[in-house]
Amino acid sequence: MNAIAEMPSPILFSDSAAAKVAELIEDEGNPDLKLRVFVQGGGCSGFQYGFTFDEIVNEDDTTMTKNGVQLLIDSMSYQYLVGAEIDYKDDLEGAQFVIKNPNATTTCGCGSSFTA
């Protein structure tokens, strides 16, 4: 019997996150900007998320487009973000980008760092 391996789902980039990024890009006045999401060592749990604007798409970047907004993720970060959802929340706790990551085995209290 042949078993079909289930492929990890790609990264989900919510409509609200794309809308907020589009608003920020418009505020910057540079339509060439793209949102780069990355994982780096640090934080109280070992890894932390980072967000920055970038005009350059690197050779090893995975790119996604949502509602005209381009998201960039480098190959090292991608392995930690497969299956994650990048969202933007504006509620009683404040306005912030949030990453729901199924690969994170533990997270810190603030949610900005994790262990994979």
Swiss-Prot record:
Cofactor notes: Binds 1 iron-sulfur cluster per subunit.
Binding site for iron-sulfur cluster: 44, 108, 110
UniProt keyword list: Iron, Iron-sulfur, Metal-binding
GO terms of biological process kind: iron-sulfur cluster assembly
Cofactor(s), names only, from the UniProt record: iron-sulfur cluster
One MF term in the entry's GO annotations: 2 iron, 2 sulfur cluster binding
InterPro entries: FeS_biogenesis, FeS_cluster_insertion, FeS_cluster_insertion_CS, FeS_cluster_insertion_RrpA, HesB-like_dom_sf
Domain of life: Bacteria
Record bears the keyword Zinc: no
Keyword RNA-binding: no
Xref: NCBIfam families: iron-sulfur cluster assembly accessory protein, PRK13623.1
Record note on quaternary structure: Homodimer.
Record's function text: Required for insertion of 4Fe-4S clusters.
Protein family per UniProt: Belongs to the HesB/IscA family.
HAMAP family (UniProt xref): Fe_S_insert_ErpA
Name assigned to this protein: Putative iron-sulfur cluster insertion protein ErpA
Taxonomic source organism: Herminiimonas arsenicoxydans
Gene: erpA
